[in-house]
Design a protein with these regions (language model features):
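Short, surface-exposed loop or secondary-structure junction motifs
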Residues: 3-141
Length: 141
């Protein structure tokens, strides 16, 4: 994934710390692959899981809903600055990997995700009422 996300070139795995204690620099993470993102085996997490110190930092930064207040580049940069919960490809954990995959589509295509889906998926399938949100004109429906 580092060709699309150079920010992920120097990821590290959690080794301790959190809360009032700084994170201990962990081992360098192995390469994260797109299949790891697709199968929730990337080492990323969700804050809502409330299990680990990494989850707590995700909650602190509101990562579960970060796309409402961070642009794609800022979101990826903040994720890249945090340690992973585990080495990519070694464990399974629901995570913001789906958000990262959406950003990959944006970076590769040069389009916003909703525009890409409308042009390449929804439009060709005749799904004219399908989108990531509603327009003001459709609120009354």
């Amino acid at each position: 994934v580092t060709r699309v996300f150079p920010e992920f070139s120097n990821l590290r795995v959690y080794a301790g710390g959190g809360g009032s204690v700084p994170f201990a620099p962990g081992a360098p993470a192995g390469p994260m692959r797109f299949v790891d993102l697709l199968t929730h085996m990337s080492g990323l997490t969700y804050g809502l899981q409330n299990r680990t110190n990494i989850d707590a930092v995700y909650r602190e930064h509101n990562f579960d809903f970060a796309r409402r207040h961070l642009d794609s580049d800022a979101f990826v940069a903040k994720l890249a600055a945090l340690p992973l919960e585990f080495q990519p490809g070694t464990r399974w954990n629901y995570s913001v990997a789906t958000d990262v995959l959406g950003i990959a589509v944006e970076r590769i295509s040069g389009q916003r995700l909703g525009d890409y889906f409308a042009e390449h998926i929804f439009g060709p399938l005749g799904m004219v009422d399908t989108a990531f949100g509603t327009t003001e004109a459709n609120h009354a429906r």
